[in-house]
Amino acid sequence: HSQGTFTSDYSKHLDSRYAQEFVQWLMNT
């Protein structure tokens, strides 16, 4: 279960990072 929790947390971190970059991309467009 610990591996699954780590994976979900890691993907959540990536999602937030991509979301921030996506917002910045929208602002620059």
Curated annotation (Swiss-Prot):
Q: Which PROSITE patterns match?
A: GLUCAGON (PS00260)
GO cellular-component term (any): extracellular space
Q: Which UniProt keywords apply?
A: Hormone, Phosphoprotein, Secreted
Highest taxon listed in the record's lineage = Eukaryota
Q: Report the induction information.
A: Produced in the A cells of the islets of Langerhans in response to a drop in blood sugar concentration.
Is Secreted a UniProt keyword of this protein? yes
The question of whether Nuclease is a record keyword is answered with no
Recorded hits in Pfam families, A to Z, give: Hormone_2
Residues with the Phosphoserine modification: 2
Q: Which GO terms describe its molecular function?
A: glucagon receptor binding; hormone activity
Chief location bin: secreted
Localization, UniProt: Secreted
Q: What Gene Ontology terms for biological process does this UniProt record contain? A: adenylate cyclase-modulating G protein-coupled receptor signaling pathway; negative regulation of apoptotic process; positive regulation of insulin secretion involved in cellular response to glucose stimulus; protein kinase A signaling
Family under the similarity heading: Belongs to the glucagon family.
Q: Which PANTHER family match?
A: GLUCAGON, PRO-GLUCAGON
The record describes the protein's role as: Glucagon plays a key role in glucose metabolism and homeostasis. Regulates blood glucose by increasing gluconeogenesis and decreasing glycolysis.
Its recorded name reads Glucagon
Native source organism of the sequence: Chinchilla chinchilla
